[in-house]
Structures are given as C-alpha cells and as structure tokens.
Amino acid sequence: MLNLQPIEYVGRTPSRPKKKHPNLIGGWVLLLMTLGIGFVIIRPMVPFLQSKRAHATKANAERAIGELKESKDFAKRLAAAALARTTEIVEYDSGYYDLSYPGGDIPSHKGICADLVVRSYRSLGVDLQELVHEDMAENFRLYPQLWERKEPDSNIDHRRVPNLQRYFSRYGKELENSPSIDDYEVGDVVGWRLSFGALEQGGSHIGIVVPGPGARSDEKWVVHNIGSGPEWEDKLFDYEIVGHYRFAPGRESSTASAENEAGISPTPH
C-alpha cells in the first residue's frame, strides 16, 4: 500500500487582492476634453441661434404684442395693433370698394399700406375713415388734389396715403424727417416716397414704427404693406422719408385751426 505524503507549497504566499481606486485624474481629463469639443462645435452656432431669436416670427410678434398692448401709452398700444396685423394673410388690393360709413372696410383679407394704418388705429377705437372724411368735407381745398375729385369720398379718401399724411400733419404732431434713429419712437407713423410707388397713392407709402423682434427689441423697425401683406421689417431708412407723425386721439391741434382760418393750401407730398 502506497504511503502518500503531503507536498509542501514553495510558491508565493497568497495575499488578498488590493482594492483598486478610480483614476480621478483621468476622469477629469476626459470631462474637460468633452467640454472643449462641445465648445468648439457649439460656439460658431451661437450667433445663428441668437439671430433666430431676433427674427420677425409669429412667436416673437405675439411676445411683443403681449408686452405692448397693456401699456397706458397709446403709441405702444398702436405698435401692438400694427404687429397684430402681421399675423394676418392679406392680398394687396388697391381697388375701389363701396364701403359702409362710418366703420367701413374692404374685405379683411385684402388691403394696402393705408389699410394697415387705418385698421391698426380702428382696433383702438379711432376711425380714420370718419375723421378724414369729416375734415375733408369741411376743408376739401386743404387736401391734396391728385385725383380730379371735386368733393370728398368716404369710400376711398382714407385709403390714400397723401390724405392720411395731410390729416396727421393737421391733427397730430408733424416731426422732422430725421436720418437719426433716435428721433423716432414706437407708435410713430412714417411716410415714404417710392420710386416704384403706385400712381393712385401719389408714389407714397406709409407704415408704423414698432420695436424690433426678440433680442433686437431696442431697435426701431416698421410694420407696413409694400405688396406682400403686412410685414415686420428693419426698413425704416430703406426708402426716402417724406413724412413723420405722432397722432393720438383727443389731442388738440392748433395747426388745423390756423390753417382753416388762413385757408392755407396743403404741402405737396
């Protein structure tokens, strides 16, 4: 019978495995590398993202309207009313329509630059159709004589830019046609002369000064309809300015009274 003897182990003494600690330095390096790569990729996109927030979008219009419409300042509420027009789809139409009076309007999906101004004021309770007609009925000779008319016409007179300019100059505050942006305020009405302007408008155009969109809200933009419907654009100085007015209801005008008494003829536009 074999006599088996135990064999002595002569290798290394077994030891408990050491607990490994995480490599914190390597983790931070990886994190910093990730952030650096992200910065390099995203940084060039920042101006683009900022510009997107400053576009004349419907969302930006609604945001601006919300900020302006509750103001006690009539001019700011007028700017809100003008911006509200930009959310509507309007086909350019300068045609003659038979309108009710007062408060008459052509179909809401049609219009020109003058209609935009008339509708903006009317939404605040100021009916330029009635105001212009009443003044022309009393002082027809003081208005531009560009259409071979012998008497006022409540269907069309308030839709003609030169007539609106004349009314604003008589009953509002007529301001300098300044080249400086600082001389214009939100809610001002501006008249331009266009080289391509419609003959029935005397080559004139009209719009309302409003804030710029989003991050550009400190800028002075305009709402106008130059053929593509109501638009919110940075175009205050893109055309020759020939009229600058500030008109709010209830403001007494010494200009109109003096002109009526003196029989002063209108300034050509």
List each model region and its residues.
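N-terminal Sec-pathway targeting helices
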Residues: 15-34
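Low-complexity, Gly/Ser/Thr/Pro-rich intrinsically disordered linker/tail segments
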Residues: 217-269
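...with weaker cross-activation on analogous glycine-rich loops/strands in unrelated enzymes
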Residues: 74, 137-223
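N-terminal intrinsically disordered, acidic low-complexity segments at the extreme N-terminus
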Residues: 1-12
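Hydrophobic alpha-helical membrane-insertion segments, chiefly the h-region
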Residues: 34-45
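Short, basic, low-complexity termini and linkers enriched in Ser/Thr/Gly/Pro
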Residues: 13-14, 18, 265-267
